[in-house]
Amino acid sequence: MTMQYGDLIQFEPIESVIQLLDANRPDEAKKLVTTYVISDDMAERIGKQIIPQLSFDESVDHKGILIVGNYGTGKSHLMSVLSLVAEDATYASMLHHPKVAEAASAIAGKFKVHRIEISSQMSLRDIVTQQLEIFLEKHGVTFSFPPADKVINNKAAFEEMMAAFAEVHPNQGVLLVVDEFLEYLRSRRDHDLVLDLSFLREIGEVSKHLRFRFVAGVQEAIFDSSRFQHVADSLRRVKDRFTQVLLARQDVSFVVAERLLEAGCRVLMPW
């Protein structure tokens, strides 16, 4: 019988599109973690930039996090994996890179996590507060944000929210992960965008002292984008309270090369 190449080379296909909300499905969660390939360069960014920001280490100037990467760079996959590890410590040992697995101990299982994808005409404040109230109710926390026209600033409301959360879940944090964030910002009109950016700045500011963490995925570095020059002043204030982590095409090339190498090893050593 003639053997076909397909009989020799078998490997897990690379998903063309991974959605953040896939991480909410138990049957997909483990697969997302075990199939995430990490280069040494990516491990450096995760271990030195992302995990310290997510951790509760008081020596760190905590900020919001923007994961920047065009379509196909693994942005949603990375956010899914990080949020799963933060939610459940058992996933940390499944990470393929030993340095990342070691660094992940600082966040493993230390958060209640809420993941959202934004495609709405609501204000950013309304989206975030509505989603957080749904999240809090799910986790047995009674809290409602005051109406937008009843607050001078939003930081006090976040402090009250985290105090209520800590009563039910002491020693844990809240991690809000948002995808499709750039598309949402692009859709906003000038005045509305300024208000959204002001709220985003406040989110970055509350991360400094509270156990609240915010991670969003964007397709380009918004602080350097010409399409947002009309709100440059607002963006500068946001930039001070956010860390940008850049993903590149070479990260995808490494994933493909690793998958093919694994397949080649199985051809040479099929046992």
Predicted regions: what they are:
Residues 1-73, 85, 234-244, 258-264:
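Walker A/P-loop-proximal flanking segment of P-loop NTPase domains
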Residues 25-31, 110-157, 178-190:
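Conserved P-loop NTPase mechanochemical-coupling segment
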Residues 63-70, 75-77, 112-114, 171-176, ...:
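Beta-sheet entry/capping signal
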Residues 78, 82:
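Hydrophobic positions on the alpha1 helix immediately C-terminal to the Walker A/P-loop
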